[in-house]
Each structure stands twice: as structure tokens, then as C-alpha cells.
Amino acid sequence: MFSYPANDEDTYLSWYKDSFSSVFVATNPFIKIPDFPLNSQGEWMPDEVNTIAKQRGVETGVTCREISELCGFSSIAHVNRALRLTGSKRIVNDLACSSDTEKMLGVCKDQHLFVPDEGYYSPLVQIALARFLKQLGHDEVIVADQFGTSPRQMRSEEFLLPEDFVPPEIYTLDKSAYLSIYTDYHYFLVCQSERSISVANPMDYFEGFFADENTNDLWGVGSLGDNLNGN
């Protein structure tokens, strides 16, 4: 079936060209719940925070664009680069920027913001996913764990349940849409056929940008000097 690109250098549109006409790079929002203590750096977001965020909804979300402005960054690409030194920190030094990470974490501490977990859909994204799939007319989808393991069917409305976990890989039964978040990353890919995107445009549901012919997993790491994505 479908899979996430094998290498960072593989461009999204080329990788999926035989199945999809567009790829949208979507970001996970940060979460603001003032009445719950922040987790320590490197720890997963508490389950209780995920549950509360799903219950309270969009009011708990802070977009990467807003984080970029709070940090004084020039684009959300800098937010992505800063996030890569949280969690597992599986990134080579040349592609990271510790000063940006420190600045972002300082802002999150001052603003009482929970940093999104790598490799998982934010609770607010899970709500948006349910709306997105409903608009596409898919009451049931196939979900799978990382690398496409353990595929099974799941009802889209279950994405809304506070206690439910949405696996990292999702594709529709008619194979017109595929979504995936890689284990080390904080953003996810929304791949669609022309007909699918004519019914539900991901820009109406998620923060992010459409990939061009050069976009790959290096869009938000490294020097960022010539990168026009994630502006």
C-alpha cells in the first residue's frame, strides 16, 4: 500500500506521483491549557492534556504561525527546525539549531504551552481529521501503525472521542486520500487525488502549505536560507 518517503531527499510529489496529484504539508498545533502543569522537556504530552484539549476544542490551540511570531522567527520552517531538538532529538547537528529550540521552549514556558509530540497527531488535528474525512464522505477508513504495520478499519467519528488514539497512517477505502506522520516528525502529509481535493481542500482544515516539485523532508531543517516552503 502507500508509505512515507524512504529518504529525506525524496520529493513528496515524485514519491506519490503514481497515486496522488497533491501533497499538503500540515503542522501540529501547540496546546494551551493553563490549569494543567507543563510536562518536563523530553516527556510525552500527558494523556489528560490530550483528553482536555479534545473536549475543549479549538480554543486550546496555538498555531505554528503564532509560535513563529512569538519567537520572532521568519517562518514556520524555523518552528519545525526548533521542534526537532525536542523529544527524541534524532537529527544531525548540521540540520538543527539549538538556539532556536531554546528560544521556542522559553516562549512555551512563559506562555504555558505544551509542545506537540513527534510522530502523533495533535488532539486538535484529530478533531480536524474527523471533519475532513466526513466532508470527503468517508465514514470508515483504514488506519495503521508506523511503517504501515497492523492495518485495520476504524470509524472516522472515533477520531473525536477524547480517549481514542488515532494511528499515524490513514487512508480512505477508495485510496483517494492518504495521511501519514513519520515517527520523528511534528508535521504530517495529506496526499489526495484531484477529485478528493475538489471535495475537501486541506487548507480549510489544517495549517500548512502545498508541496511543490522540490519539497521534501528537508523543508524545515538546515540553513533554511533558500527554502521558500513554510513561509
Residue ranges with predicted function:
Residues 179-231:
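Alpha-helical oligomerization segments
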Residues 108-109, 119, 155, 159, ...:
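Alpha-helical context
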Residues 33, 62, 159-161, 197-200, ...:
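Generic alpha-helical propensity signal that fires on short helical segments
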Residues 4, 12, 16, 120-121, ...:
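Sequence-level detector for tyrosine residue identity
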Residues 139-196:
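Amphipathic protein-protein interaction modules
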Residues 5, 15, 52, 126-128, ...:
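Sparse, context-dependent recognition of short Cys/His-centered cofactor- or disulfide-binding micro-motifs
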Residues 1-157:
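Extended, low-hydrophobicity segments enriched in charged/polar residues
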